[in-house]
Amino acid sequence: MWIVACLTEGTPNRGSGASIYPAVQNMLLAARALGLGATLTPRHLFYEKESEAALGLPDGVHSYAIIPIGYPMGKFGPVKRGPLNGIVFQDRWGMPYASV
């Protein structure tokens, strides 16, 4: 399945679609929680007019993200995370984060 995130207001540009991305993030998290694979795909914006024509979008409706969602082919288990102290710093670069 594809979800096409669109706006109907304003002149189309990548900045004006910024309000869509928090909703897209929530959809990605929800898909993951349901065991589905999903990703944000904005590459169609390089061919905006052709993409909108192929999707059959009416005039004034502009797509900003396509989210393909489906069942993964391989193993889709829990995410493994490393320690934060190697990637999160406190106050300045290289100073390990001291969690409370």
Regions from the PLM with identified roles:
Residues M1-V100:
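Acidic, surface-exposed loops and disordered segments
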